Amino acid sequence: MKGLFVTIEGPEGSGKTTLIQGLLPYFEQKEQKVMATREPGGIAISEEIRTILHKQEYTMMEARTEALLYAAARRQHLVEKVMPALNKDYLVLCDRFIDSSLAYQGYARGLGMDKVFEINRFATEDCMPSLTIYLDIEPEVGLARIAKDAGREVNRLDMEDISFHKRVREGYLQVVERFSDRIVLVNADQPMEKLIEEVIQVIEDKLL
């Protein structure tokens, strides 16, 4: 693996997708080979799994099923899209990766971070990001953003009650503490222009 693998993490409404779209032009104009992708998804098989995971009517989905589906989507996306790009010296910007599973299924769903981490170690063959940016935001603020975004389709996880979203944030903060060597916490409750500038600085300071 020769490229740089940067993952962007955060609760619902933290601005991950918008941030990545703001980062792309900066690195492109610097003639850095850069690729944006997302989880679950990014390639056909994983997008199909994403559809299943996000369907509002699948409220009966059991936590282990959910965790295994995310890991399956992650595996296919990694081998089909991420690894080939890294081997061609790309900077890969990925919207979510293993830390999402630790926060959502490991902590918020109560499966245990260690168990979920082992599932994902198997799925990824211990491939970890070069750097992770965690966008921290209060759940109420993030969910309010989602409610105002008419273009965003509400998915099954968005529909969880506020206590679930609070547990997700608590889980993320534990993940940040556990993997402090590669995760940088950034306050997401600020104008997007300032957030983009701050994250560019972090990426350049840490990796470039």
UniProtKB/Swiss-Prot annotation:
GO-annotated biological processes: dTDP biosynthetic process; dTTP biosynthetic process; dUDP biosynthetic process
Keyword Transport: no
EC number(s) given by UniProt: 2.7.4.9
GO molecular function, one term: ATP binding
Record keyword Membrane present: no
UniProt-listed InterPro entries: P-loop_NTPase (IPR027417), Thymidylate_kin-like_dom (IPR039430), Thymidylate_kin_CS (IPR018095), Thymidylate_kinase (IPR018094)
Keywords: ATP-binding, Kinase, Nucleotide biosynthesis, Nucleotide-binding, Transferase
Binding site for ATP: 10-17
Gene Ontology CC terms: cytosol
Pfam families in alphabetical order: Thymidylate_kin
Catalyzed reactions per annotation: dTMP + ATP = dTDP + ADP
Transmembrane segments: none
Record's function text: Phosphorylation of dTMP to form dTDP in both de novo and salvage pathways of dTTP synthesis.
Family named by the database record: Belongs to the thymidylate kinase family.
Protein name per its UniProtKB record: Thymidylate kinase
Gene: tmk
